[in-house]
Amino acid sequence: KIAENMHYNQFVPYTDRLDYLAPLANNVAYACAVEKLMGWELPPRGQALRVLCCELARISAHMLGVGVCAMDVGAMTVFLYTFTEREKVYNLCEQLTGARFTTSYTRVGGQLRDMPPGFAAAVRTFLVECEVAIGEIAKLLDNNKIFRDRMVDIGVISRESAISYGMTGPNLRASGVDRDLRKCSPYLGYEKYDFDVPIADEGDCYARYQIRMEEMRQSIKICRQVLDTMPDGVIVLDHSGKV
């Protein structure tokens, strides 16, 4: 209702608040919807920047999920690992956008600004460090008897229940539903990147943990491909119309 009295880009900051703990990706769905209605196609570099932002946000969100889950079942050390990596994502957010949480970086028709000098190198450094951290987390949790006792066969959600509840994302895929919009209905050029969509059939807490761990690995893989193939050119459409 608020958006009805705004210019389309004035509404972007409101979408930040949908999940301010995983910034960068929050504006994308709204911007993509407006662009689709207008029949606009983003410049290749603008699309690649959005993919990079979305995958960094995915890593940040999953680090929160894994860390808090581990702490809730008694694995405090893992929480320290995950929040260290999330802090690095926030540092990247600040370097790219000037803000750590409510970034308002996406614009209808492109992005607010291009990558600053040194940003790509900083992302590559983070990806290496994050990959190491994921390995350490896996060592601490994957075969930990106490962790498994508190996660395996707990909170089981069947495939049918997951669908009927309208579940999405990693929780849906942990219940055996092979659905990821990046694969089944690609946007922003996701079809150009090589990555897997992890699926589990158990539908329990441990499966949901495993899905998030593997999705972070796949996000790292995507981010590297984005940086390796980043096209030149503009990051925003040259348009003067109003929606």
Residues of each region from the PLM?
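Metal/cofactor-centered catalytic core regions of large enzymes
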Residues: K1-V243
